[in-house]
Every structure is written in structure tokens, then in C-alpha cells.
Amino acid sequence: MQILPAIDIKNGHAVRLVKGDFEQETVVNDNVLDQASIFMEAGIQYIHVVDLDGALEGRAANRDLIAKIKEMTGLAIEVGGGIRTIEQIEDYLSVGINRVIIGSMAVKHPQFVKEALDKFGSDKIVVGIDAKNGMVATEGWLETSTVDYISLALEMEKMGVRLLIYTDVDRDGTLTGPNFEHYEKLIAHLTSAKVIASGGIHALSDLQQLEKIGVAGTIVGKAYYNGDISLKELREFEG
């Protein structure tokens, strides 16, 4: 199972939120490039980067900083937050970003995902499904749709998406453990798409359980920043 430490960027800093609430923001590192270097030096291979300003504004707000992370560290990077146009995706891929995550647009304009898949391929395009009580949340989690997470996942899989990131918003940043039941259900419904888990991870035992369920990767944020799981443990777990 792949482990992806997370860097959430807001106002140029690495931050953590609780349940996606921008009022509950903690700066975990003033210097995003420094944080990326810490991951690189620990032997981490792949990181998950979220442009929170971008998610709120619907644009690639921290694009230059993210391009700098790639240039400086050479880490494999997936990026999400504010992806609304094909040009943005093209731009991120052109500076060496490995995967781009489409979130809100998958719910509001599914055709956009199809267009991105046709142009860039399923290894470059990831769909992020964020849910509150099983219903998909959009626009930086400020809005909740009437679509449930399984329906959206199946629609995306049918379209050709091969990698989904599922975040349980109610667990994100809470350190209360992932919603294992949701992952089991999701994986049972899918036939070809793989799932990356995100939200609520608080101990190595969570990672073991997710691996057992059949999750392809896990994003780790607060558990690392709080000191509950070390980078050494994450590296060893990944093998």
C-alpha cells in the first residue's frame, strides 16, 4: 500500500484543518519547501499536495509554489484544489506534477473528467470524492451535494477513472480513525478502480486495517504532524 504524506497549502504555509473547517486552521510549517524537503530526506517517494486557497477560489492559487516543490525535491506529487480547467491540468503536468486530482468538477460537470481522461490518460487523472455523512461535498467542502459517494464512484469508474481518493470529511483532521465501513463498501462496489484513503488516520493500526480492506494507498496528514506516526514508521510500513 502506498503512503502519501500530505501538505495542505494556505497563504503560502503548510497547514492542517479539522473537518475541512477553515476557521480551525493550524500552521504546521511556515515554509512549505522546508516541509517538502523533510519528506524527501526521510525517503518518502510520493506526496499529496492540496492548494486550499485554490479550492476556495477555484483557481491554481499556489501553482508556482507547487512547481517549486517539484523542481527542488524531485518527489512524485499529486495535486488537488481548485482544478477547474483543462489548461490548469496541462500546466501542472508540464511542470512535472505526476497526478492531478479533480474534485468539485466531477460532481458538477462530469464531462470535464471525461475530457481530462481522454486528453491525459487515467494514470494522470485522479478523482477526489469527499463526503459528509456519505453525501459528496464540493467547493472546498463548503457545499454538500445530493449525490452519494458510491454513486459518484461508480459513475467515475464507468467513465474510465482508475484511481479515486475517498475522504470522509467528518473524520478529516480529527485523529479518530478512518471510516473503515465506507472503504469496505466502496471497494466492494468497484471492479477496476483503486481507492486511496484519506481522513482520520491516527495510528499504524489504521494503516494495517486499511491495507487488509484492500485500499491501494493512504494519505497521512495530522497523525504525522502531531507526532503520532513518524516518517520512519511510514517508510517502514510501505516497505
UniProtKB/Swiss-Prot annotation:
Keyword Amino-acid biosynthesis found: yes
This protein's record includes keyword Membrane: no
CDD domains, alphabetized: HisA (cd04732)
Pfam families: His_biosynth (PF00977)
Cellular component, GO annotation: cytoplasm
Pathway(s): Amino-acid biosynthesis; L-histidine biosynthesis; L-histidine from 5-phospho-alpha-D-ribose 1-diphosphate: step 4/9
SUPFAM superfamilies noted in UniProt: Ribulose-phoshate binding barrel
GO biological process: L-histidine biosynthetic process; L-tryptophan biosynthetic process
Localization terms from the record: Cytoplasm
Transmembrane regions listed in the UniProt entry: none
Superkingdom of the organism of origin: Bacteria
Active-site feature positions: D8, D130
Main localization category: cytoplasm
Key words, A-Z: Amino-acid biosynthesis, Cytoplasm, Histidine biosynthesis, Isomerase
Family: Belongs to the HisA/HisF family.
Alphabetical list of PANTHER family matching this protein: 1-(5-PHOSPHORIBOSYL)-5-[(5-PHOSPHORIBOSYLAMINO)METHYLIDENEAMINO] IMIDAZOLE-4-CARBOXAMIDE ISOMERASE (PTHR43090:SF2)
HAMAP family in alphabetical order: HisA (MF_01014)
Name listed for the protein in its UniProt record: 1-(5-phosphoribosyl)-5-[(5-phosphoribosylamino)methylideneamino] imidazole-4-carboxamide isomerase
Organism: Streptococcus mutans serotype c (strain ATCC 700610 / UA159)
Gene name, Swiss-Prot/TrEMBL: hisA
